[in-house]
Amino acid sequence: MTLNVPLIDTQNLDSALELQGARFDVACVNWPETFPYAPLCSGRVARTKDALVVDFRVSGLDFRAQNTEDNGRQWEDSCVEVFIQDPSQAVYYNFEVNPLGKVLACVGPDRNNRVPRPKEEMKDILRFAQHDRMVTNDLEGVQSWRVCIVIPFHLIGVNPEHLPASIRANFYKCGDLTAHPHFLSWSPIFTEQPDFHRPEWFGELFL
């Protein structure tokens, strides 16, 4: 899977994403026998001079938003995720966002050796979310929500003045503790069990 990521003007970010952002669908049901549910999840990706911008739009059952702090257990909520790797690096970065715009951000070489980003770096990650408070009980029925995350290139070890030709990435939708757990991806994953920490299955974003 590949995408060409356009450079956009930040003066009107919403319109620029809608008109110019590269469209993607998070629609690969990689483990249909055990986790068949597939909420609708799509988005647009673009870049500014110094950041990657990813805008997610979701519609599905079991709206859950209980993690109210950064670097929590965001994957248990209704959650969208961006995993990124500069091909020249041995590590990759994961950014996991719930509907409140609260982010889990870590770096490391594999699933078992993740290091959370410090608080002073978390404030550099811009988020735009429609919801701003915890949902104590999961909302039933189909719910729609949107969240946009702006990830500075310096937080993924990339010099914005000398961008690589491409980076590797995958986009995910999950909800481990929702009534219908699901594990969707943009670029397909070929493993027996759900595992998003597989950079060998990342797609490519051309910058």
Task: Describe the predicted segments one by one.
Residues M1-L207:
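Structural preference for beta-rich elements and adjacent junctions enriched in aromatics
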